[in-house]
Amino acid sequence: MSTASAASSSSSSSASEMIEAPSQVLNFEEIDYKEIEVEEVVGRGAFGVVCKAKWRAKDVAIKQIESESERKAFIVELRQLSRVNHPNIVKLYGACLNPVCLVMEYAEGGSLYNVLHGAEPLPYYTAAHAMSWCLQCSQGVAYLHSMQPKALIHRDLKPPNLLLVAGGTVLKICDFGTACDIQTHMTNNKGSAAWMAPEVFEGSNYSEKCDVFSWGIILWEVITRRKPFDEIGGPAFRIMWAVHNGTRPPLIKNLPKPIESLMTRCWSKDPSQRPSMEEIVKIMTHLMRYFPGADEPLQYPCQYSDEGQSNSATSTGSFMDIASTNTSNKSDTNMEQVPATNDTIKRLESKLLKNQAKQQSESGRLSLGASRGSSVESLPPTSEGKRMSADMSEIEARIVATAGNGQPRRRSIQDLTVTGTEPGQVSSRSSSPSVRMITTSGPTSEKPARSHPWTPDDSTDTNGSDNSIPMAYLTLDHQLQPLAPCPNSKESMAVFEQHCKMAQEYMKVQTEIALLLQRKQELVAELDQDEKDQQNTSRLVQEHKKLLDENKSLSTYYQQCKKQLEVIRSQQQKRQGTS
């Protein structure tokens, strides 16, 4: 028997032993691998390779282990998936024993991570989609936490493990290779640092509240469409160290207080201070009343050839000013806010302030008790053109306005749609492009021409030569164009010619104004960039100093550990000598 066949046989027998164990009651179908037609590799999971395949005339995803070390994760996922049945958890159709693989529901929309940060063109999505994804995720996790006789902890909640179907409107949780029973203690750190609760990598004791922490990070990520702790960079231990010291993702300007409160409660250092997933489901279900349109399929950017737009996705919420927060007990300082440069966001903010003033006595009814972090540092704005996060600038006004009677007031979802950047526009360095609502509209209709228009070509002077009357008036607005003259009246012709020349001069002045304004914007942008460069230089100096201090602290800690190790070794040698 070959090595490959021996490994396959060993995997098969191991899986078979686990499946047939009397203590395990697994609800799945054993599938003959010959019935499966593998089409293509689509990615990797908690273990092995994930492939798209056909099984009984339907699309499925199959997970195959690649090594013996992945067999344990395979058994874990098989055992956990066979226990669950929920619309927001990927469905297990069955398993093959030779070769060992899982046959599961196929998600044509890919992972939430790819929708947020994948290759272009990226889809547009609204605040309703973002809130709906988080609600569905919380519903699936709440189901896991409430399972009997033993609840489940996922332990690896993150956008790569959240799949989308039905045009991106339905979310399903996958990758149970790291899931465990709620009584289990962690023996080796699994999961991903950016979404991992501090207690998970600080020690081995943790509860289902570690999934709550991960969910709070995901909520921030889908609203901002930014990778959590992306500004820290480097290896994973740097993120772990920052989270251990109380660093959290930056707060979001214009985010409604109920959402911000829920999000920051999930980030609490103390797991007991975090809400349960059941409470999160109740709060999110209530908030979803203010976010209509979550059932609309995701839209991908189309090509606007007449405007010279690229099909790269842009930000839906780039007006949101962000400031980093640290959850240590310090006062808020150095809050840097990026000014909104577009009139639309200013109008939204004014609406928000008006509604807050009118409903100030009632607004407290929806307060969830903020646990906002304190020590604030500036997060450098991202300049990636593919940002398309959900704009929350108007939602709080809508929540406050309905707090009195509890009935949602219908507002246009267009207030929350994505924005685009026109290539000819000069935006601020805060990646705050001007707003372009996503509405299907035809080309701008031209102004109707006058009936029987008179043109200069129809007229000649008394000497029979053509008049060189400027044609600039044809580009003016209809109300500014000169009236057609009477060809038989010299006075009328003279007035018309004078009007045409004035129109040409008017167009020349307007063109100069436009060019000067454009140059002004360029100079402002250059000045802004210079200021940003100075700020970045200062930030880099501070970061370098911080890293030096951190390195010194770690070196000291290393020396202490080294001394402790030497003491322990010497004690052991003494014991061995005496024995």
Swiss-Prot record:
The keyword Transcription regulation applies. The modification Phosphothreonine is found at residues 184, 187. Its EC number is 2.7.11.25. SUPFAM superfamilies: Protein kinase-like (PK-like). Its main location: cytoplasm. GO terms for molecular function: ATP binding; magnesium ion binding; MAP kinase kinase activity; MAP kinase kinase kinase activity; MAP kinase kinase kinase kinase activity; protein serine kinase activity; protein serine/threonine kinase activity; receptor tyrosine kinase binding. Its cofactor is Mg(2+). The modification Phosphoserine is found at residues 192, 367, 389, 412, 428. Association with TAB1/MAP3K7IP1 promotes autophosphorylation and subsequent activation. Association with TAB2/MAP3K7IP2, itself associated with free unanchored Lys-63 polyubiquitin chain, promotes autophosphorylation and subsequent activation of MAP3K7. Dephosphorylation at Thr-187 by PP2A and PPP6C leads to inactivation. 'Lys-48'-linked polyubiquitination at Lys-72 is induced by TNFalpha, and leads to proteasomal degradation. Undergoes 'Lys-48'-linked polyubiquitination catalyzed by ITCH. 'Lys-63'-linked polyubiquitination at Lys-158 by TRIM8 does not lead to proteasomal degradation but contributes to autophosphorylation and activation. Deubiquitinated by CYLD, a protease that selectively cleaves 'Lys-63'-linked ubiquitin chains.Deubiquitinated by USP19; leading to negative regulation of TNF-alpha- and IL-1beta-triggered NF-kappa-B activation. GO terms for cellular component: cytosol; plasma membrane; postsynaptic density. Residues 306-338, 416-425 have a biased composition (Polar residues). Residues 1-300 are annotated as: Interaction with MAPK8IP1. Signal peptide: none annotated. Keywords: Apoptosis, ATP-binding, Cell membrane, Cytoplasm, Isopeptide bond, Kinase, Magnesium, Membrane, Metal-binding, Nucleotide-binding, Phosphoprotein, Serine/threonine-protein kinase, Stress response, Transcription, Transcription regulation, Transferase, Ubl conjugation. Residues 301-338, 354-391, 416-466 are annotated as: Disordered. Changing residue 562 to R: No effect on ubiquitination. No effect on induction of phosphorylation. Belongs to the protein kinase superfamily. STE Ser/Thr protein kinase family. MAP kinase kinase kinase subfamily. This is Mitogen-activated protein kinase kinase kinase 7. It comes from Mus musculus. The lineage of its organism: Eukaryota, Metazoa, Chordata, Craniata, Vertebrata. The gene is Map3k7.
